[in-house]
Amino acid sequence: MAQLSFNAALKMNALGNKAIHDPTNCRAKSERQMMWVCSRSGRTRVKMSRGSGGPGPVVMMSSSTGTSKVVSETSSTIVDDIPRLSANYHGDLWHHNVIQTLETPFRESSTYQERADELVVKIKDMFNALGDGDISPSAYDTAWVARLATISSDGSEKPRFPQALNWVFNNQLQDGSWGIESHFSLCDRLLNTTNSVIALSVWKTGHSQVQQGAEFIAENLRLLNEEDELSPDFQIIFPALLQKAKALGINLPYDLPFIKYLSTTREARLTDVSAAADNIPANMLNALEGLEEVIDWNKIMRFQSKDGSFLSSPASTACVLMNTGDEKCFTFLNNLLDKFGGCVPCMYSIDLLERLSLVDNIEHLGIGRHFKQEIKGALDYVYRHWSERGIGWGRDSLVPDLNTTALGLRTLRMHGYNVSSDVLNNFKDENGRFFSSAGQTHVELRSVVNLFRASDLAFPDERAMDDARKFAEPYLREALATKISTNTKLFKEIEYVVEYPWHMSIPRLEARSYIDSYDDNYVWQRKTLYRMPSLSNSKCLELAKLDFNIVQSLHQEELKLLTRWWKESGMADINFTRHRVAEVYFSSATFEPEYSATRIAFTKIGCLQVLFDDMADIFATLDELKSFTEGVKRWDTSLLHEIPECMQTCFKVWFKLMEEVNNDVVKVQGRDMLAHIRKPWELYFNCYVQEREWLEAGYIPTFEEYLKTYAISVGLGPCTLQPILLMGELVKDDVVEKVHYPSNMFELVSLSWRLTNDTKTYQAEKARGQQASGIACYMKDNPGATEEDAIKHICRVVDRALKEASFEYFKPSNDIPMGCKSFIFNLRLCVQIFYKFIDGYGIANEEIKDYIRKVYIDPIQV
């Protein structure tokens, strides 16, 4: 709907002079900067025009007498002896001349495409090479393995895994610590370094390394109390390491007040564990090696995975082997040492986490379309190991974790796999809080991010998803407000997902944001920091940048074509309408090169619909609108002689476009589809006539009547049918109504458009006399309801509609081409983002301009 009504008010007596002088009733100044006032008796039409340069004259024209009276200092334009409105819209931010000057080397040079093709092959090879997971070494875990002893032939103890001890000996950093050199985290360095010093001291070797390591620990222990928050795992494990170091005679400042506090806190938690004779709390299992004093080593064996590990942790597994001699633990560790060349990672296997994370990473970067088969293979693998209990990092993980499960739920559902959100209930405590709230380390924060993202895909009445949203959203907002982590990449991701949740996230905008914040040297954190080479990958980033720029160059060519068409057709000279070619193009939310014809058709039709919207609301009389509608119904240009010339021109441009696009549709579909194409246009213009009749009669419809009419006049029907028929897939006649009007998904997306629009435009429309909005109709149906009540109700309706639309979209339907479904479904995105704060179509604001610049104008530096 246009945001400017035909009249500023229906009752001149009710408004009086206030309509002219009250700034509340002249709110159009900032959006349309014009107003009409009609009186019942004399049908007096008042045009008030305010130019951008300040107040100007207002001309009052009486249609009954033909006389005019200047009531302020401006002039009026009369067309065919009928006063017409000529709206002073916000200027077009992307003028024809601006678009035509765009240049890029990525369209003309084949070098970029050739390099992109090479990278696609390399990344496919990476997919094909996926095994149990590629992950960086962990000094902390390797030191645990190095501490293990065996009995030599002379009865003395010796290292059971000397290769692990050698690795520790050879991998100290220059500052005396152990860890990932490029990333410093105090807790990570202290765990790695303390355990490495212990391992060397146990075997009385590396005296120089021990001395340097002890000095590093002593210097940094004093900083520990300055950390914002210590993870629960650290609070259990680190005091235990200090006890071991003290027993070995390693010289450290054990009497520091904060160290004593940590030890006291640990003792209290150990008392709780001792009281739970048959169970170790789930949130403490990850710190198993810090619980040696209280573990029943017979009972703990029930937590052993099929691969012999405990929670896929080499450190925990080494601790159990040290205390039990279990052969399966030995085999697990021995195999890891062979695989990683004398060291071990912080967890293994990670085959499920790696596959899910790689798919998620590829799709975030906007390059998923190049790897459809590889993605399917990876997700088929994950789905084979999916469980109602959830999943862990690897297929043999005995205890599921929230991060992998939430990521799996989202990714699998996104790709049409049947997964229930009830799996999330396994990660809530008795108070309904998810396990992730136990601590605020990076990995736990990451799990809440994926919990939030999973809840984006909620279906109606999914309690688990609603609970996840209620937990995750405030958690993440608080994390942003308090800055509990210095992880820049993660925080940028949190900012994006909170600001632009899935129903508002335009694919190209998401890709641009992810590329701009991508870190190919990124680390994750469990007990210690770790890298996953398949994710911290420069090849993926390089391809994403090249692909974005190559696709952007195509989009620029399309925009040039479209702005040129708009100008040459004469539509750019129409002064009663908004000129929003770039914004309408952005609204398609479809970026793939193969859908070029779809985008072009959608944009041309959409631009004309904006014009028709403004024509109906601003320019045309009711009789003229009826004549125009009759021409549409009869598909006949000969009925236009009674309407103004500019309206005739608009009709002819539209009619010519319909013929051209229909010819293109015939080529793709192999048959004439005009009968299908005409129907939504007839419905569309019939609704305009109905709305005008209600307005002229001063009638406010019921909420139900309103939706039946206004959800159609929002215009998705006409602007989507021909584009989806140009997507290259055959759409049978009986399938058209399954994907288009009146399908459930189509109506739900239209409903979300209509009502989301209303929440940001109703006040300005009300001030200008356009009484029928969703808010007003709801208040009419519910006497006593306030505007706030109505908005809350509408937001609930929109939320429900989006959930139902998601259900319809993901529901299996083999006869409906997926590209067509996606095109319709993705149109929900633009209305959510365009009306996030204001009327993004009516007001050409900088935020929308910035979106378009990022996606279509500014290339990414390669």
UniProtKB/Swiss-Prot annotation:
Its EC number is 4.2.3.17. InterPro entries: Isoprenoid_synthase_dom_sf, Terpene_cyclase-like_1_C, Terpene_cyclase_plant_C1, Terpene_synth_N, Terpene_synth_N_sf, Terpene_synthase-like, Terpene_synthase_metal-bd, Terpenoid_cyclase/PrenylTrfase. One of its GO terms (biological process) is paclitaxel biosynthetic process. It comes from Taxus brevifolia. This is Taxadiene synthase. The Asp-Asp-Xaa-Xaa-Asp/Glu (DDXXD/E) motif is important for the catalytic activity, presumably through binding to Mg(2+). Its cofactor is Mg(2+). The keyword Magnesium applies. Mg(2+) 2 binds at D613, D617. Catalyzes the cyclization of the ubiquitous isoprenoid intermediate geranylgeranyl diphosphate to taxa-4,11-diene, the parent olefin with a taxane skeleton. Keywords: Lyase, Magnesium, Metal-binding, Taxol biosynthesis. It catalyses: (2E,6E,10E)-geranylgeranyl diphosphate = taxa-4(5),11(12)-diene + diphosphate. The keyword Isomerase does not apply. Binds 3 Mg(2+) ions per subunit. SUPFAM superfamilies: Terpenoid cyclases/Protein prenyltransferases (SSF48239), Terpenoid synthases (SSF48576).
